[in-house]
Amino acid sequence: MRLVPALLLSTALITQSVQAADINHQGAQELEQKFNSYLPETLAKSGLIKVRPGTADYEITFDPTILLKDVDPKTFSISGLKPLLSMIRPMEDGLWHFSQSADLDVKGQFTAGTEKTDFTYKIDAMRTEGVVDPDLLYFKSADMSANGLSMTSTSPQQSVEARFGSMKSTMNSTRATPETIDIRGNTALNGFTETIIDPSKMKVDISAGTVTADVAFNGLAYRPLQDLVFFILDNVKKDKLLATEQVRLKSLVRANLPMFENLLESIEVANLKVATPTGTYGAETLRYTIDTNGLKDDAKVGFGVTIDKPSLPQGLVPDAFASALPETVTTRISLEKLNLASGITYLIDHANFDTDKPLTDEQSAEAGRIFMPGGAMTIRYDEVSARSAVYDFSLSGTTTVYPEDQGRQNTDITLYAKDFDKTVSYLQKNATTVPEFGQAAFMLLMVKGFAKQTPDGRQMWNITVDESKKVKINGQDLPFQP
């Protein structure tokens, strides 16, 4: 099997597009050959991809059933799959117009261990239209939509039924430099419902008004990634790689570092409700974020969750606690100072892909020390906050831990409290109903003695804990320490 460099295909497509005012059989044959040149030889000859000339477009047929011909029907079976028809039209600027309209209605079964799972997937209608850059082998821009998306899964462990009313998605890619691109995508789904039933017949219903997702890749080095993907496609069915192929794989992985400059992703769920036997829980908004700055040394990986206006079943908590429920809760943390590039390089330099255990215990330990310089992992609290009508707390700072040296850590965080006296007053007023509030009010008044006031009126506590577990608050030693 051979690999055809991406440049060969892109050059051929660009050259052909200039000449392709006429859609003809020769152009279709050349295009089919170029598409199949990226596939393993057996797939290239299987009819997985076929191209024929249409009136104004080339008609490309992708038949997914061919990929399943060698699958044991005792472990996986599916019915309803049919070929997908796409239309590609060359444009004068060397780009390609792409369109596809289809639907999906499949059902099947797979076996994992001794358990069988039945599944169905259905999409009433889906459409994609966009512009493909043949040099990128990716969309320069695209708009996608779908209606009536549903799935079911039934096994001895549980049954799941989920549905989206509709989906719309857009994406754009632009060249940041001659070697890198920026990709931005947005997806919005409406009318989400999901029902889960476990073996005890306990039922959980989940629903959301909308689910939106935004993804941004900045500075993605696309050419090394293309080479790696094609290498994997060319060798995916091999149990073991030849020595020369292992060398090639390692060089491809090195060439992909740091792969991208930044990845930003956010998912927002609006009007979330979770109905359980104990009542309905919910939130006006649930947001999840992830961000990282590439597979490089001194890398950072961040995660975040925000819940706006969470709700609990009526009567689950005493009335006195109602005002204490947060209106907004946010947790954003980052893992910092990770030497990802050096760690990955060590792995590919020392891993033996021909054994079940690619690294020895000593090599695994050394890899851990490389990924985390000095054996330290730094956790940064970018924002941890909780706000309600009676309190407003937030903190930021860092904690450094040493996974191989349990108990060794140091922390430096700063805690802020707005309207502190209002919080204490609320606890004192409700102490007769909730005795624990009285104890909490007493503790807060004690802690206030260590506080500093910021120019905006908030109370502030800088709290440090060193490796000997000695605690300081705003530079003062905490009393009664050993």
Residue ranges and their predicted role:
Residues 1-20:
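Gram-negative bacterial Sec-dependent N-terminal signal peptides
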Residues 21-482:
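Glycine-rich, small/hydroxylated-residue low-complexity segments
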